[in-house]
Amino acid sequence: IPFQAFYSASKAAVSSYSCALDNEVSPYGVRVTTVELGDIHTGFTQARQKTVLGDDEYGGRISHSVSQMEKDELSGMSPEVIGTYIARIAQKKNCAPICVAGVKYKILRFLCKILPCTLRGKIVGSIYAK
């Protein structure tokens, strides 16, 4: 996500770590799963402390990106739906290393696997950093 490089990188790192750890400990009957939740409608959006330092230099793209993320969060899944999904995964004996909540995010994850990196970047940029 533009202007969220650390956030995006940390999510990628957690997923990679989870997959590697699952591979290391699965011979001992231990499974590790990352649950990719997508947007969740919580009080986080209203509590966000915004800073758009550099917005003028980027032609308003930072504030547009934050605004789009807020819209996504406000239309996200409820915490109850996510909690039920996580509980269902936790009860499984054998789970995939990465589980994705919601049909929308499953489709997006699939598209990320098949689209070239440059095209993915252009699509995400057109949504979040016009």
Descriptions of predicted regions:
Residues 1-5:
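Active-site loop immediately N-terminal to the catalytic Tyr-X3-Lys motif
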Residues 10:
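Active-site helix of classical SDR
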Residues 13, 18-26, 31:
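Catalytic Tyr-X3-Lys helix of short-chain dehydrogenase/reductase
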Residues 43-47, 110, 122:
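Residues that scaffold the ATP/ADP-binding catalytic core of kinase and kinase-like folds
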Residues 97-112:
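Short-chain dehydrogenase/reductase
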